[in-house]
Amino acid sequence: MRKILFAALLLALTMTAALGEELPKAPVNMEIPPEAIPTQAEGELETYGLTFPEEMPLAARNFVLTARAQFEQHPFEKLPKANEYTQWYYRDKREIGWCSVFQIWCAYHSGLQLVRYKQDVEVAPGDCISAMEGRVGNVYYAFEEHGRWLQCDQVEAIPKPGYLVIYGVRGSTPYTHVAIVESVTELGDGVYELTTVEGNINSTIKRMNYRYDATPKKKYYNMSVVPEGEITQENCQYTLQKDTWYITGFCQTW
């Protein structure tokens, strides 16, 4: 038994040495969702000219501004799969998809309450929340069980800044990618123009600008490009990431 324990200790030390520099440590035990940290006061974050609904809570506003600040820090920059967001969350250098980890990082640093799927925790109607789930499907399940999920075929599925948007792939999965809604413009007839901040789009942080049809003729064809002559947002990707993607629904963070 002693030989086994010694061998295990030696292996752990060898792996630590192989990693080289010390890994950035998450401020909490990431197996357990942390309590919301105090959100920054209004005026302490760059607003980038964004305006928000009057009823939008400060933490939800900071969620958007924190995500935007990360984009401005790494605009369209190709990041490794093991990056500052994944190492903060997983506490190691694993290479893995990180779209949800990005929103978790932004939520934690904005003061949102983080919840998990199948976690016995009470969420009040006025609480600002996000899901501490690395898998996009579990983000959906976490919001659904707390009554904060808006399916796209529901009349009340109206996007708002600070919500999460979950994308699906036609003929494959309804939960392939998650992003943060930065701004929403209602165009009439159930059509909205969305600008989003998205982690891990081709290994980058991008701002995407496109149109969402809440009442499409075909259920899985609810995204379209903004006509070239009607583009008003700057520094965005204006093409759809993939033609087979569609919006599955929205997570009500607030």
Predicted segments with their positions:
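Intrinsically disordered, low-complexity Ser/Thr/Pro-rich tracts
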Residues: 1, 15-26
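Residues that form generic nucleotide/phosphate-binding pockets
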Residues: 66-70, 142, 253
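...with weaker cross-activation on analogous glycine-rich loops/strands in unrelated enzymes
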Residues: 113-206
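N-terminal Sec-pathway targeting helices
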Residues: 1-7
